Amino acid sequence: MMTLDPDLQSIQEVRNCLAQAKEAQKALEKMSQSQIDAIVRSMAAAAEKEAERLGRMASEETGFGIPADKKRKNLFVARQVYGAIKDMKTVGIIRRDEQAKVWEVAQPV
């Protein structure tokens, strides 16, 4: 059985991830504000639920930081950052300036 060079395997994994990301982006582009809001809400809930485990994993993987501090950082993002962005409009016309004849249109990417 032929083994793949680790660098080549990593490059292929990145290519696969990029292809999946492009497909996900195409799906996100078609979603409504309520669908995007539901995704972001679910992401924040998952981040909060898994804050301790993810903090521990980050510390173990990098060899840096204290798992409890990583957990606090994850909880901050899951709670405060989510709270700050949850009501942002991110789909469709988000601002109109009739005087300048400018409309700002958002599209999820």
Predicted segment positions?
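N-terminal Rossmann-like NAD(P)+-binding subdomain of aldehyde/semialdehyde dehydrogenases
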Residues: 1-109
